[in-house]
């Protein structure tokens, strides 16, 4: 399953960044979706939410686990 991220520029290898809400909506029910920094949008769509600080923590953790 693809991982699609909205609201962040930096993502791990293999994750897809989308720049618009319209593009994000096309991935609903087809990918695991993460919205960074817009809790309202994440709640509206029923997808995962990370604050910008949490996303930074995730990136550091991911890089450590996968030796990036």
What are the residue ranges of the model-derived segments?
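Conserved nucleotide-sensing/catalytic segment adjacent to the nucleotide-binding pocket
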Residues: 31-33
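Ser/Thr/Gly-rich flexible loops in soluble cytosolic domains mediating phosphotransfer, phosphorylation
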Residues: 2-3, 39-68
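A short, well-structured beta->alpha microelement
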Residues: 6-29, 51-54
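Structural motif
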Residues: 4-10, 35-39
